[in-house]
Amino acid sequence: MTHRPGTPTTAPLAVRPLADRTDLLAQAHARSVEVGLRASETPDFHPLRQPALRNLVERNHSLYAHALPVMETLHAQIVDTQSMVVLTDSHGVILHSLGDNDFIEKARRVALCPGVSWAESDRGTNAIGTALVEGQPTVVHAGEHFLRANRILTCSCAPIADPYGRTIGALDVSGDTRGFHKHTLALVRMSAQMIENHLFSNQFADAVRIHFHARAEFIGTLYEGLAAFAPDGTFLSANRSALFQLGQPLAALQQQSFEALFGSAFPAVLQQTLCAPGECTTLTLPSGVRVIARGEFAAPRQFAPAAGLAVQATGTAAAMRPSAQPAAPVTLAAHDTGDARMA
């Protein structure tokens, strides 16, 4: 596969490169020993009582509400593979799970069920706990688990961040070791990013949102960059793809103006958003890469743009307008695009 010079790729779930798995697992095992765990230990079979679990779910209501439909879609992709989809909070406590009936009993034997903590300090090396510690997608397969009891599992997990980049939970697919598939982690990563985008759009529903990508057909998809601004142009936040395309961490972006980030004056872009909703324009990133962008402002009646601003729509705006087709569910086929920019 080739990569077109000067074109931003799609962001991986982790901004930093994935660590070498051998080192990652060795460090996780060392931490497991340091907290006093023994490989021969029997898993804790005492989940939170129902009232405590309900309270925990309520405290994580936004995560739970936005993750549930994504979990159902993900489970539909792996049904009948002796697997289950698991959602945890930021501490690794399972909030919800969906699984194949023939695997649920096996999962219960290792306490893989709601209300149980799968933090690394409680379960040793495992995909959920280790992904949360490392802050990156993680696979832990069979004998790589620290506790022998968990070596019947193969697990793929990705952390979930809130719209400000703080880890608030994790999404995991765990199953029988015989059902291991190398593409499972890709599905989990895509699903976690979908949850993050839903959380982002909900958090900034009343903000000015800029949807952008180097390729017009990716606007409105999982892979688009999203940047949110207050009506006065103050930068609020950006999703993973936007951070990757802009090439800067969130803290650095918060110190910059719209014009510094996109090469255009914010009032002009906002005016186009208000007067020609759905129209696309071309913006320039700090790297010099030109991207297709579409503004969105859900509460235009609450804001009056400065007088005298003209709409700066380009002559090719109609041609650049992305397809209105609904997004397809997460599938392996959608992930394997043959394009390095989708990696």
Regions inferred by a protein language model and the residue ranges of each:
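Intrinsically disordered, low-complexity terminal regulatory regions
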Residues: 1-142, 152, 161-164, 168-232, ...
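Amphipathic alpha-helical regulatory segments at dimerization interfaces
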Residues: 70-78, 130, 244, 260-268, ...
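Short, surface-exposed beta-strand-loop junctions and turns on beta-sheet-rich folds
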Residues: 101-103, 242-245, 299
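PAS-family sensory/regulatory modules and their coupling/dimerization elements
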Residues: 143-144, 152-157, 262-324
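Sensory coupling linkers of modular signal transduction proteins
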Residues: 171-204, 219, 294-343
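Signal-transducing coiled-coil/dimerization helices and immediately adjacent hinge/linker segments
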Residues: 198-264, 319-343
